[in-house]
Amino acid sequence: CLVGSEMCIRDSPCALTIGTYGVARRREDKKLRFYSMNFEQLGVIESSVEGLKPEKEADWTNYPKGVMWAFGEKGMEVTNGMDLLLFGNIPNGSGLSSSASVEVLTGYILRDQYGFEVSNQELALIGQFSENKFNGVNCGIMDQFAIAMGKKDHAIFLDTATMEFEYAPIQLEGAKLVISCSNKKRGLGDSKYNERRSECEAALAELQQVIGIESLGDLSEEQFETYKSAIKDPVRVKRARHAVYENQRTIKAVAALKANDITEFGKLMNASHVSLRDDYEVTGIELDTLVEEAWKIDGVIGSR
């Protein structure tokens, strides 16, 4: 995500040229056979399309199994087994959404094999639904949406409240997007996502006592400063401030991209990281060090 975050109403993610690749064969029986070239030590993991449920020993295959289950929940029953081989070049646990990539790929395969009439946007929502309800991870929609709807040389301006979106051109003549890996491993299951979501929801409930809003994204910076005293806990004030200000930064970032003002976009990236570090407190020493060292380098326009 270039600017924005899962707790914000508006995000600006973009797609990458790395991803997950698969070869699938529909079976005549109910057996599922999964193999990942990234986890060769696990060998072939077997399951069945009947009675799909998450299992610890199923490891990574809980993601494609979850999508199969989600299709059934949406009225598109997966009746046959499958042999599925996957290979991905997304670093696992790097924050680049390898699990969401597996989910969307599984959706593409099922659509192709069964002729289901489902759009790419609906595939993203099915991926999120499977992760929430089958795997029990309270993720947002941004990762799956960026993967399913990504467009070359464009960021996506996504309103997660309404699912309305538009593409914003990324014109980087003389500049490049660089992704640095901190080697700090984490998954959504052990991240601060659920905790931050709960804090933001509590802050929203307090603000709703004094102003008629449906989400933190409905507030401008000025309105937040006016009404923030309604939030009783100083930690929740910080969390809500990040959500409100980051939402506005995303709107400004899209305007900067449309105007081909990469310098302004970089400033917004920098401000985004400071907010993630100080108000949202989700960065950590590894990310902070990478960003702060990048800021020292001549020619770096922005870093988060």
Q: What is the meaning of each model-derived region?
A:
Residues 17:
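Conserved short S/T/G-enriched processing/targeting/catalytic segments and their helical context
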Residues 5-6, 10-14, 23, 41-50, ...:
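Gly/Ser-rich oxyanion-binding loop with an adjacent helix/lid
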Residues 6, 11, 21-62, 72, ...:
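C-terminal nucleotide
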